[in-house]
């Protein structure tokens, strides 16, 4: 009977994380762009200066990904994610009182730690150990589908609150929501998979027999570095397009409003795309499905480079948006599939160090390349070529040595 009681608890963890990831992403990640203009108007700092604080936070989150993963492998996700939520709540309260640029940067430097402890990487690590391969993809898909609606739910709500009450009061409201929703769920729902008992998928897994490489062993394989580099450039591409799409298309005769709508639809395409990733991965294998994602990003980026010559950019929006949506899920499931779940947190954190670092580097890096290469088109073509190479690399690299420690 204890086994039966534990049989479905993995799905309780998934349900809790669906709620907390949606709220955490909606407030901690998507909240900053909503606060940007009102902060600019009140504080008097330039948009570049203000967004620099956000980039610093992303950079700190990337650097913290590896130690966060190691902690979860050893101690589980409950304490870390609970403390991360508590830290985030406190920082939102401090942010609401910020008057100077150094104070804002200090808040977001610390916020990077909160992001690393509450967003996808720790959530995925909390889920993976509960499920065998056949159910793991579905569990991770469920979390990413729910969190995919974070911007849809929170950005309009935050904009309405800012318009009605101002950005400082809005941050107080968001801090309250984050505290009331995420802290209790992280503290009370999350737990480590049971040792020596059947897991949520109904498979007998004794802890000592859980398959998987250590981080050190994984780092000695070629596939680890291929994945790390590939996901770095995939994330770099996604965030470069998000930041630079409006100025690029505006220079080519598109209205800023239409360009903004395209960004919105790029995000909207991510949710349905995630639904089809699992069947594709089952049919063709995780590596083939992941390689196809990089080819899809390359195809979408090539269409974007030809924007001035194409009658419509709808195919670009569909292909690039779908590929971007699958990428987050692919990173989580492919790492677990290739390296095993035993040290998933450490390995995922190491890959995330580059992938999330790309999120911080992309806005500035793409701008630098645009100047150095003389325009956006050469940048897009360069990234297209890199993504094609990444796709072939993921598909071709050998994995016979993995998943056996």
PLM region spans:
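Extracytoplasmic
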Residues: 12-47, 65, 155, 241-246, ...
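Hydrophobic core of transmembrane alpha-helices in multi-pass small-molecule transporters
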Residues: 22, 91, 102-118, 144, ...
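Extracytoplasmic gate region of multi-pass secondary transporters
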Residues: 29-37, 216-272, 362
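Intracellular juxtamembrane helix-capping segments at the cytosolic ends
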Residues: 39, 117-131, 326-339
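Conserved MFS/SLC helix-loop-helix module at the cytosolic interface between two early adjacent transmembrane helices
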Residues: 63-101
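Helix-to-loop junctions at the C-terminal end of transmembrane segments
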Residues: 64-76, 273-285, 370-371
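Structural signature of the two symmetry-related core transmembrane helices
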Residues: 79-93, 288-303
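Helix-loop-helix hairpin linking two adjacent transmembrane segments in secondary transporters
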Residues: 143-193
């Amino acid at each position: 009977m204890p086994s039966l009681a534990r049989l479905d608890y993995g799905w309780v963890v998934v349900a809790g994380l669906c709620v907390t990831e949606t709220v955490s992403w909606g407030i901690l990640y998507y909240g900053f762009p909503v606060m940007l203009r009102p902060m600019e108007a009140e504080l008097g700092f330039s948009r570049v200066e203000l967004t620099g604080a956000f980039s610093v936070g992303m950079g700190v989150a990337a650097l913290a990904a590896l130690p966060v993963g190691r902690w979860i492998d050893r101690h589980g996700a409950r304490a870390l994610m609970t403390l991360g939520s508590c830290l985030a709540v406190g920082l939102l309260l401090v942010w609401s009182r910020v008057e100077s640029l150094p104070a804002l940067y200090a808040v977001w430097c610390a916020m990077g730690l909160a992001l690393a402890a509450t967003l996808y990487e720790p959530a995925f690590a909390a889920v993976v150990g509960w499920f065998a391969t056949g159910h793991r993809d579905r569990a991770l898909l469920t979390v990413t589908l729910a969190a995919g609606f974070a911007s849809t739910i929170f950005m309009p709500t935050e904009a309405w609150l800012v318009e009605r009450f101002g950005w400082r009061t809005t941050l107080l409201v968001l801090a309250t929501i984050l505290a009331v929703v995420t802290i209790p769920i992280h503290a009370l729902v999350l737990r480590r998979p049971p040792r020596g008992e059947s897991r949520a998928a109904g498979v007998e897994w004794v802890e000592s027999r859980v398959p998987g490489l250590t981080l050190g062993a994984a780092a000695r394989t070629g596939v680890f570095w291929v994945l790390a580099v590939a996901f770095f450039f995939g994330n770099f591409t996604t965030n470069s397009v998000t930041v630079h799409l409006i100025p690029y298309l505006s220079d080519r005769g598109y209205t800023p409003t239409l360009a903004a709508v395209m960004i919105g639809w790029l995000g909207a395409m991510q949710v349905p795309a995630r639904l089809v990733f699992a069947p594709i991965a089952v049919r063709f294998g995780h590596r083939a499905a992941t390689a196809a994602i990089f080819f899809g990003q390359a195809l979408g980026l090539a269409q974007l480079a030809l924007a001035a010559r194409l009658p419509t950019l709808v195919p670009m929006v569909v292909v690039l948006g779908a590929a971007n949506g699958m990428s987050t899920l692919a990173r989580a499931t492919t790492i677990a599939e290739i390296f095993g779940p035993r040290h998933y947190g450490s390995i995922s954190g190491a890959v995330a160090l580059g992938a999330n670092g790309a999120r911080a580097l992309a806005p500035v890096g793409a701008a630098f390349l645009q100047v150095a290469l003389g325009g956006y088109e050469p940048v897009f073509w360069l990234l297209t070529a890199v993504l094609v190479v990444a796709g072939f690399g993921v598909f071709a690299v050998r994995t016979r040595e993995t998943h056996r420690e």
